[in-house]
Curated annotation (Swiss-Prot):
The keyword Protein transport does not apply. It comes from Neisseria meningitidis serogroup B (strain ATCC BAA-335 / MC58). Pfam families: Iron_traffic. This is Probable Fe(2+)-trafficking protein. Belongs to the Fe(2+)-trafficking protein family. PANTHER family: FE(2+)-TRAFFICKING PROTEIN-RELATED. HAMAP family: Fe_traffic_YggX. GO terms for cellular component: cytosol.
Length: 88
């Protein structure tokens, strides 16, 4: 049976992830409080942030920015909006 969590992003009980997405405290916090569905939505948003801002994951500042955005997306007021993106 799937592991269930109360997802802080979706504000409902949903299927949790199979393992922590990051090997740190933020990863543990996400594992305990974020559903697979919300994580998938974050990865799509993260991809748009990387592409629109032309981020290089080899750059430590870009990785730090994405970590901050991830924390804001799940536990804060939301991540930065992607410039030029118009939802359909």
């Amino acid at each position: 049976m799937a592991r269930m969590v109360f997802c802080v992003k979706l504000n409902k009980e949903a299927e949790g992830m199979k393992f922590p997405p990051l090997p740190n405290e933020l990863g543990k916090r996400i594992f305990e409080n974020v559903s697979q569905e919300a994580w998938a939505a974050w990865t799509r948003h993260q991809t748009m942030l990387i592409n629109e801002n032309r981020l290089s994951l080899a750059d430590p500042r870009a990785r730090e920015y994405l970590a901050q955005q991830m924390e804001q997306y799940f536990f804060g007021d939301g991540a930065d909006a992607v410039q030029g993106y118009v939802p359909q």
